[in-house]
Amino acid sequence: MHRIDETFRRLRAQSRKALIPFITAGDPSLEAAVPVMHALVRAGADVIELGVPFSDPMADGPVIQHSSERALQRGVGLAYVLQTVDVFRQSDAVTPVVLMGYLNPLEIYGIARFTQHAVACGVDGVLLVDLPPEEADEIRPIFSAAGLALIVLASPTTSASRLARLSGVAQGYLYYVSFSGVTGADRLDAQSAGDRLRGLRAQTQVPVVVGFGIRDAASAAVMAVDADGVVVGSALVTALSDAPDVDTACRRADAFLAPLRQALDAVK
C-alpha cells in the first residue's frame, strides 16, 4: 500500500496526473506479461492494474472478456498472476501493482493465504468489482493488517450515503467508474463525470481516479481535469491482443501509452 501512497504524493507535489494502464495477466501471451509491464512503466505508467482472468467477468465488456478467456485457455490462474508480480518486482521495486478481478478466485485460493502471498510477491492493492459491502468489511481488516489496499469502486448510480461510507474507508485510491455499464463501452459524459469527480475529491482523503470510456490521449486529458488520475483498459488490451511476439507487444504498449502520458502532463 505504501507504494501507492508514495506515488500519489509524488505526483501531487509535481502537479501531475496518474496514468494507470490495465492489462490482463497472460494476454497476449504468458511470456509477454512482465516485459509489457516494464514497457508500460517506461512509457509513463504510474500504477499498473493487472487483471486476474475469470470465467464469468460480468462487469467487463467483450474486449476484456475475450482477453480473460484467452488467458484462461493458456492456464492462467491466480498463482500465475502472483508469480508475474513477483518476477516484475525483481527489477522494479517502485511501481505500484494493483490486482483487479472478481472475488471467487480469491475465495478458492483462500483470503488469508492470498493476502500473505500477494504481499510477499509485491502486490500493493486489490480491486474486486463484485465484492459485496458486507464481505468488504470482513476482508478490509485482513488486507490492512498486511499493508494491502482494498481499492473501492464508485459509479454514477452509487447513493450519497454509500459514497460517504466509501469515502471514509477507501484505501490507496478510489476508482470512479465514469458511467454505469461494462468496460470498453464508448459513451463518455465528461461533464457529468467531472461534476461527480469534484464532489468525490472533496469528500475523501484518498486520490480519486476515473476509468471506463478512456480510449486515447484526448479522452484521457478531458477526464483527468477533475481527477487525480485515469485508468485505461479496453483500448490498450485491444492494441496488445494480437501481438505475435513479446517485442511487438512491448512496442505496442509503448506506442499506445506514450501519447496518453504526454497528454496528461499537459493537464494542470
Swiss-Prot record:
SUPFAM superfamilies assigned: Ribulose-phoshate binding barrel (SSF51366)
Short name of any one Pfam family annotated for the protein: Trp_syntA
UniProt-recorded Gene Ontology molecular function terms: tryptophan synthase activity
The keyword Amino-acid biosynthesis belongs to this UniProt entry's keyword annotation: yes
EC number(s) on file: 4.2.1.20
Enzyme class: lyase
Pathway(s): Amino-acid biosynthesis; L-tryptophan biosynthesis; L-tryptophan from chorismate: step 5/5
The entry's keywords: Amino-acid biosynthesis, Aromatic amino acid biosynthesis, Lyase, Tryptophan biosynthesis
Active site annotation, chain numbering: 49, 60
Catalytic activity: (1S,2R)-1-C-(indol-3-yl)glycerol 3-phosphate + L-serine = D-glyceraldehyde 3-phosphate + L-tryptophan + H2O
Presence of the UniProt keyword Amino-acid biosynthesis in the record: yes
GO cellular component, one term: cytosol
InterPro entries in the record: Aldolase_TIM, RibuloseP-bd_barrel, Trp_synthase_alpha_AS, Trp_synthase_suA
Family: Belongs to the TrpA family.
HAMAP family for the chain: Trp_synth_alpha (MF_00131)
Role: The alpha subunit is responsible for the aldol cleavage of indoleglycerol phosphate to indole and glyceraldehyde 3-phosphate.
Subunit description: Tetramer of two alpha and two beta chains.
Protein name in UniProt: Tryptophan synthase alpha chain
Organism name: Xylella fastidiosa (strain 9a5c)
